[in-house]
Amino acid sequence: MKIIVSACLLGSDCKYNGKNNLNDRVIRFVAGHEVTALCPEVMAGLGIPRKCAEIRDGKMVDSDGRDMNFVYHLGVQRAIDLIERESPDLIILQSRSPTCGVRQIYDGRFTGNLISGQGFLARELIRRGYSVMDAGDV
């Protein structure tokens, strides 16, 4: 099986804070499969570390209130280009991320509150009919 996974889940230090979300359950789940890692935020050219970003009123803003919509959509498009080339059977994405969150995202006020919703990449992949799984469901 061909699986694409958020790079942070596999131990890549690509989160906004320069850390990772290494997930042993995901590592065990994908063992023995063809795995490709991706991080749409890094694919957009955003640095590590970088300002935290959340979706507010449908647009991506960073913790300084700057509009980051274009940059994040660029990363999503680059990720989709890779995904279309790879034709994966499954995509496992990082929970709560403004790009990758599948079921929940932060509320856009930088207070740590979660709301139902999807990150930019997750929403687009689901719209296109890909099989997408939240890392928390592995």
PLM features: residue spans?
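Internal, conserved structured core segments that host functional sites
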Residues: 94-105, 109
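Divalent-metal-activated hydrolytic enzyme cores
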Residues: 43, 53-55, 59-82, 86, ...
